[in-house]
Amino acid sequence: MGLKKFFKIKPPEEATPEQNKDTLMELGISVKNPSKKRKEKFAAYGKFANDKAEDKVYAPPGYEQYARPQDELEDLNASPLDANANEATAGSNRGSSGTQDLGNGAESNSMQDPYAIENDDYRYDDDPYARFQANKSNGRGSVNAAPYGDYGGGYNGTSLNSYNNDGPYSNQNTSNSWVNANGRNSLNHSNSTLNVGPSRQTRQPPVSTSTNSLSLDQRSPLANPMQEKRNPYADMNSYGGAYDSNTNRSSGTRQGSSKNANPYASMANDSYSNGNLNRSANPYSSRSVRQPQSQQAPMTYTPSFIASDEAARNSEVDLNEEPRTGEFDFEEVYADKSAENRAALDEPDLNAVMTNEDSIDLNASEVDHSSRQQQQQQWFMDEQQQQQQHFNATNNQYGDQRGYKTFEEIQKEEEARQQQEEDEAVDEIKQEIKFTKQSSVASTRNTLKMAQDAERAGMNTLGMLGHQSEQLNNVEGNLDLMKVQNKVADEKVAELKKLNRSILAVHVSNPFNSKRRRREREEQLKNRKIEEKLMREQTSQQLSQSTQRIEGAMNANNNISEVRERYQRKNVLEKAKRYQFENDEEDDEMELEIDRNLDQIQQVSNRLKKMALTTGKELDSQQKRLNNIEESTDDLDINLHMNTNRLAGIR
């Protein structure tokens, strides 16, 4: 049984970090002040470096998901009806992909409750698919309207669905005011349906039927009508009649063209002619009742012999027949024009009465004869002048039509040709000079842009090196504190070892050298404080030098003053005259821009050189600091290991 247990001696309580810090401060030992924060000049570049950093992992193909932390597993017990189900789903989607589809997000936020009571009653709807189109609507306010509803018949047609169902399976037939008796408009067939079987024979007011409709009715009524193409304009003849393919004549009573006439009516035998387009009715509808419409012609059947008699009777044309109302008459239209264009003959009119103007007045005076003679001379001179002008123009153009040219004419032509060639050569040189200048301007712009990009990258590199230097300074300061406190720990371990000796080993200090020991102790504390201060100053000096280097490289912009640029403009224009030919304002601007860009490129190049040198020096300095940090860390690690072993050996 030990003495400690016998006297019930307990070990002292472990001191907290705050108590330990206060104790060290009372003893005069340096500690770290957490409230003191150094101002960092390059903290923004540190944030920039963190944003640009990439977490690169290495994994074989197909195993990339194991190199990253697994996402949260989906809750299998989650229900769409939960309050936070949509938010959790959206959050997981954002976490996995980083983006969210707007369309899918809208659907997920508006999920339908399968247990909710339906507000719309579809029990009496003929269309079983109408509920899936309840949210759609065309421009006319129908609930289940088709998006491509009939164009011209939505307001004058008759709806056959008692519940106003205008869906794609409804039997609603609409009419259009533009359709003819035997045709349907192509814009009015989206929702119209026809019976597959033979149509009902109904009586309608007499309308003009075409031969095309007869030929269509002679077909088998049970044939598949969907195999034939449909021309929406086949039955709408501009003259009210139809075209007979056998006689190549228009049959029926011709009528005057109106504003509603169809210009495509002659295309009756086109491969896209209007067939009997049949569409099946809605198989789910029980109220599909077909009602006759006043504007649609009945589909009647006419025997072939009656059709041939009508065609033969219509083919006979009476040449003496008077033109009908509204019919185009060629003679009436072009009679006046032919009369106007008919040139009058120069033959004399033998029945015309002779006047005094055509005869010579023998009793006229000499004055009248002289005036008449002067007038004739004037006419003759004008005629000669016109002939001379025409003659000169002909000589200039065709060399007098003599078959040869004079020496003067040849010399003039040669001079004109040489002048033209010289002008063309000068213009070509001008264009080459202008093109070269434009190319030079573009080249200087591109070079300046690339130089500025390189300068920006260099500044970013220097900024990140500055932030790295600040972080290294923090590490060095912490290592200095660790060195000082580790020395204090060595002394405390030695003192503890001395106090933990055997109780029989009495240690008594020499009373005659107490003053000397006190002086040694004071010198030791003083030297320790000086050493600590020197380490701190050295660390701060390294940071200051690094900051000055980086700031000097980043602040060297060398901005050009306006006064210098104004005086430099004159010098540039004077030097540019050697390379200019008939220069204008545009040429001067290009010369100035070229000189300005070259000057800026030179300045950027100088700054890039300075940045490169500064970067090299900074890297060397930080490399030395890193080596010192490595050595200091190794020494501290060894000292801590030794103190730990010493403490373990004290019993």
Curated annotation (Swiss-Prot):
Q: Ranges of Basic and acidic residues compositional bias?
A: 120-129, 313-327
User: Per the UniProt entry, what is one GO biological process?
Assistant: Golgi to plasma membrane transport
- Do you know which InterPro entries this protein is assigned to? T_SNARE_dom (IPR000727)
What segments bear the compositional bias annotation Low complexity?
Answer: 285-296
Which region ranges are annotated with the description Disordered?
A: 1-22, 53-299, 313-332
Instruction: Show the SUPFAM superfamilies listed in the entry.
Output: SNARE fusion complex
Name the domain of life this protein comes from: Eukaryota
Q: Name one GO molecular function term.
A: SNAP receptor activity
The UniProt keyword set, sorted, is:
Coiled coil, Phosphoprotein, Protein transport, Repeat, Transport
Q: Where is the composition biased (Polar residues)?
A: 86-112, 157-218, 244-284
What Gene3D superfamilies does the record point to?
A: 1.20.5.110
At which residues is Phosphothreonine found?
Answer: 355
- Residue ranges constituting the t-SNARE coiled-coil homology domain according to the UniProt record: 434-496, 588-650
Q: Which GO terms describe its cellular component?
A: cellular bud neck; cytosol; fungal-type vacuole membrane; Golgi membrane; plasma membrane; SNARE complex
Q: Does the keyword Phosphoprotein apply?
A: yes
Q: Describe its partners and assembly state.
A: Interacts with SRO7 and SRO77.
Q: What is this protein called?
A: Protein transport protein SEC9
